[in-house]
């Protein structure tokens, strides 16, 4: 998968047909035509080269309105109609509305993918700005098991990342958190991710600076409790739009994803993720589950997306060695973190990253080395300061 294609369809049959004939060549973002504002904002957010619009022959005017809205929002997107039946008059109407082609579900199954590819290729050759222009990096932190404490990992990852990326703005997002908490940090932000998604309007820098607390210089926190319902259908499109808008306001976004929703997050925003960190314990069943998760990740992210393995709680005298883990995953373990349970407890209870505790730990040193290698090459080290004391 190299890019996203948007499908605007109220008819489930048309969506299923497109998923089948297009196979997995594109990431198909589906939503209904009931909210033209949502359709337009998603087209703008994705910069999708092709938009497929299902046409109901009994209500063709709705499809024509969708064509008009998309052309206004993103004139460079190429439009393709999809219909179960197609009269000559209807074909002329949608072509006048700007469609480059129209696929008929009962006839064009064998040729649909090639026709869409030709139009997508022609759109890619047009002299337009890249869809990701002006968009910051997006890093997902995931795990195959809920036993893994990705909250603690993210707490230290974002603090260390912020320390090494001087002059950059970072948004740390916990997609499944308690009220007023982001990871183990106290969060005094006025808005949650759920509320940003439900706003239905644009997110600008003024809103971010007012509503999201700056925990450290350059680091802001955002909490959420994203349920399965917000990761499906039109709600998933709203999530994509919100994440895309936030990504234009920050140099780097780090999102902790709950293991129960990893697949849904990958389907929703995987095409625009720059980096995925998979955290696992050195336990056989978790390593095997991580192997399966890595295969799923490949289906939803772009080839240039960097993928890293972090082994948390490793002990070199344990029977499961790093080489065994790497052999199973067919991938190098990029970060190895010791348990150091007492130090972890102190950091969790204090609501502070390891870097700001009195004791210096191997965990902190290894995390810093990982950041320097993978995320902060050439960056100037930031002087570490706190905006407020932990409660």
Feature-to-residue mapping (PLM):
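Beta-strand-loop-alpha "switch" segments that mediate conformational coupling across diverse proteins
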Residues: 313-314, 322-355, 367
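Phosphate-binding loop that captures ATP/GTP phosphates
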Residues: 164-221
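Conserved catalytic-core segment of NTP-binding enzymes
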Residues: 241, 247-252, 257-335
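Cytosolic-facing regulatory segments adjacent to core modules
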Residues: 200-267
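Walker A/P-loop phosphate-binding motif and the immediately C-terminal alpha-helix
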Residues: 135-177, 181-185
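C-terminal output helix
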Residues: 107-116
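Conserved phosphotransfer microenvironments
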Residues: 38-39, 49-70
